[in-house]
Swiss-Prot record:
The gene is Chrm3. It is a multi-pass membrane protein. Homodimer; the dimers can form tetramers. Interacts with NALCN. Interacts with TMEM147. GO terms for cellular component: basolateral plasma membrane; endoplasmic reticulum membrane; plasma membrane; postsynaptic membrane. Expressed in cerebral cortex, submandibular gland, hypothalamus, pancreas, liver, and ileum. This is Muscarinic acetylcholine receptor M3. Keywords: Cell membrane, Disulfide bond, Endoplasmic reticulum, G-protein coupled receptor, Glycoprotein, Membrane, Phosphoprotein, Postsynaptic cell membrane, Receptor, Synapse, Transducer, Transmembrane, Transmembrane helix. The keyword Phosphoprotein applies.
Length: 589
């Protein structure tokens, strides 16, 4: 038998003659393949095979300069893909700031892109240059399995990231409490398992299901994708449907972020105006935690801390939110409450914050001693946020109790700043109360007396400044949270945009090929498929452009500054340890 091949082709360069006939069996293949009937003319006039195809030409019909150009370009892209995704993985390992739930999904995406850069790109380049598959059927099926599983895993990871961002924005209280690294690992595992189950068994064992292998020798493509209708269906399920879902989710994320931005701007604009009006309530409280049921659990525990000119009594009270309030929190988690209790609850619901009990939480009442005065502001019974009355023009008077034993006030501004920083995170309650102790001869009883003493204008201004500082801290925390969400949304938008740009041309050609099997030149097929690979090259660039932490860590790794960073961190910890030990006796006073 004599084997004659009437095809001499160079897929990437259309100026070289090609007699490939594009039949329905070639639809949607990564490389324009030759149908078995049109590629091979079997002649029985000779006892041996003769061939005029490129099987004996290692360059596949290309010129030497074409081979150099193809090898250099594709090799460079593969190298950039490998280095970029290795940087992502190593950066995640060495920088603890990157070990967030959202970045676990990016780590999974980087692993899929790394597989494509190491295996898929190089084998496909060899296939293009040689213009035939010379590694055998088993290697062909393994390559296709790895290629399609990794590519589909990239799509699934993008889908998971989109849903994660969507629920984080729209359900910050309910979803973030469940958003842990363990659940992220489960979602990542499902993405890979689903991708493997969908593609690997069908690619590896389809020839055994149908009883024969229809892929001709020297070619490599998925056997069950020989029909355009099947190829069309897989394109819809693997690309168009996920892209549609991700686009809708991103649009919802964008609208919700814009809504949050307007709400925060309104909160900041009305904050200064409403502060003077609501600072003193007719009942003595501008805001209250009336929506929560305060429940005293036994004896109150109080402790005293001293920071500079501020003296604090932290009185622990346990409280449980009412059933009605819990329902409101779960049903309308999008709204931003203006009270401090709701703000603290919203912040505690984040997975990045400190874990708090599901039912019982702690409220700390702060007792403030104004510098240079012998009075102390103490917490009282009402659970108000800033229950303060001062002798201003528009304000009332403030009831305070005189302390019999005057406390020494330290006027260190640094310690005062630390004082403000410590209680700015808590629902602050400024009220008037002090206890004066009268010790009897037997030291058996302690009496507490109260007296009304108006504050001076200077002291009232200072107290009001503390309340304004607290409100600004709450607004700042909301603003920082919004900025963080915007950065995550920007990263998602960049990744999604790169995915759509790189994957759309090939999938459009798949749709066109369903109705016109000879309208797409082989060069376009190969370029379109390679463009899908380039998406794995672009993703690390998106991380660096949209995330400053990734960018600085990449720079540190490329410049080999890991050891310097570790030494600086150790030196900083040693300095902090010395400072801490020096301050221990002072804090113990």
């Amino acid at each position: 038998m004599t084997l004659h091949s009437n095809s001499t082709t160079s897929p990437l360069f259309p100026n070289i003659s090609s007699s490939w006939v594009h039949s329905p069996s070639e639809a949607g293949l990564p490389l324009g393949t030759v149908s078995q009937l049109d590629s091979y003319n079997i002649s029985q006039t000779s006892g041996n095979f003769s061939s005029n195809d490129t099987s004996s030409d290692p360059l596949g019909g290309h010129t030497i300069w074409q081979v150099v150009f193809i090898a250099f370009l594709t090799g460079f892209l593969a190298l950039v893909t490998i280095i970029g995704n290795i940087l992502v993985i190593v950066a995640f390992k060495v920088n603890k700031q990157l070990k967030t739930v959202n970045n676990y999904f990016l780590l999974s995406l980087a692993c899929a892109d790394l597989i494509i850069g190491v295996i898929s790109m190089n084998l496909f380049t060899t296939y293009i240059i040689m213009n035939r598959w010379a590694l055998g059927n088993l290697a062909c099926d393994l390559w296709l399995s790895i290629d399609y599983v990794a590519s589909n895993a990239s799509v699934m990871n993008l889908l998971v990231i989109s849903f994660d961002r969507y629920f984080s924005i729209t359900r910050p209280l309910t979803y973030r409490a469940k958003r842990t690294t363990k659940r992220a690992g489960v979602m990542i595992g499902l993405a890979w398992v689903i991708s493997f189950v969908l593609w690997a068994p069908a690619i590896l064992f389809w020839q055994y299901f149908v009883g024969k292998r229809t892929v001709p020798p020297g070619e490599c493509f998925i056997q069950f994708l020989s029909e355009p209708t099947i190829t069309f269906g897989t394109a819809i399920a693997a690309f168009y449907m996920p892209v549609t879902i991700m686009t809708i989710l991103y649009w919802r994320i964008y609208k919700e972020t814009e809504k949050r931005t307007k709400e925060l701007a309104g909160l900041q604009a009305s904050g200064t105006e409403a502060e003077a009006e609501n600072f003193v309530h007719p009942t003595g409280s501008s805001r209250s935690c009336s929506s929560y049921e305060l429940q005293q659990q036994g004896t109150k525990r109080s402790s005293r801390r001293k920071y500079g000119g501020c003296h604090f009594w932290f009185t622990t009270k346990s409280w449980k939110p009412s059933a009605e309030q819990m329902d409101q929190d779960h049903s309308s988690s999008d709204s931003w409450n203006n009270n401090d209790a709701a703000a603290s609850l919203e912040n505690s619901a984040s997975s990045d914050e400190e874990d708090i009990g599901s039912e019982t939480r702690a409220i700390y009442s702060i007792v403030l001693k104004l510098p240079g005065h012998s009075t102390i502001l103490n917490s009282t019974k009402l659970p108000s946020s800033d229950n303060l009355q001062v002798p201003d023009k528009d304000l009332g008077t403030m009831d305070v109790e005189r302390n019999a034993h005057k406390l020494q006030a330290q006027k260190s501004m640094d310690d005062r700043d630390n004082c403000q920083k410590d209680f700015s995170k808590l629902p602050i309650q400024l009220e008037s109360a002090v206890d004066t102790a009268k010790t009897s001869d037997t030291n058996s009883s302690v009496d507490k007396t109260t007296a009304a003493l108006p504050l001076s204008f200077k002291e009232a201004t200072l107290a009001k400044r503390f309340a304004l500082k607290t409100r600004s801290q709450i607004t700042k925390r909301k603003r920082m949270s919004l900025i963080k969400e915007k950065k995550a949304a920007q990263t998602l938008s960049a990744i999604l945009l790169a995915f759509i740009i790189t994957w759309t041309p090939y999938n459009i050609m798949v749709l066109v090929n369903t109705f016109c099997d000879s309208c797409i030149p082989k060069t376009y097929w190969n370029l379109g498929y390679w463009l899908c690979y380039i998406n794995s090259t672009v993703n690390p660039v998106c991380y660096a452009l949209c995330n400053k932490t990734f960018r600085t860590t990449f720079k540190m790794l490329l410049l080999c500054q890991c050891d310097k960073r570790k030494r600086r961190k150790q030196q900083y910890q040693q300095r902090q340890s010395v400072i801490f030990h020096k301050r221990v006796p002072e804090q113990a006073l």
